Amino acid sequence: QGLEKVYAGRGVLCEFELDPDARFQGEVGDLLEVLGNLLENAFKWARSRVLLSTRVEARAGSSGRRLCIAVEDDGPGIADAQIERVLQRGVRGDEQVQGHGIGLAIVQDIVRNYAGEMMVDRSPELGGARFTLRFPLSR
């Protein structure tokens, strides 16, 4: 809600598709840091829409499950050739856009600390960037 207020002048709307069974098994501060960074980036680049979704999914080749969190926007997206670069500490996707270039690197560090994975691609629904995080669930 805070980000919607900050970006209200641009008319960006945040939508939610949340699985009621999806629970993050970790420190609340880590989850807030991850979501804050991903949503801030999405709002920065979005034309009009941001989507946050969560779900629980089966882990491939295992009996375990994992939490999947995705943040998508309808902005210009990130070219495949630029994905690795924008995940580096201190690198920004566009020098004209405000930021320090450390947010995505922090997200990646936190995800790795939980033995999770982060994937960056194009949102099939919105057309912009999609950041998908997967965290193993212990139960």
Residue map of PLM features:
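Short beta-strand/loop element within the Bergerat-fold HATPase_c
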Residues: R49-G64
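Short conserved segment of the HATPase_c
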Residues: I78-G90
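Acidic ATP/Mg2+-coordinating residue in the GHKL
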Residues: D73
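Short alpha-helical Gxxx[C/S/T] motif in the catalytic ATP-binding
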Residues: G103, V107
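Conserved catalytic submotifs in the C-terminal HATPase_c
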Residues: L13-R23, E57
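Glycine-rich ATP-binding loops of the HATPase_c
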Residues: A115-R122
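Conserved polar catalytic motif of the HATPase_c/GHKL fold
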Residues: G36-N37, N41
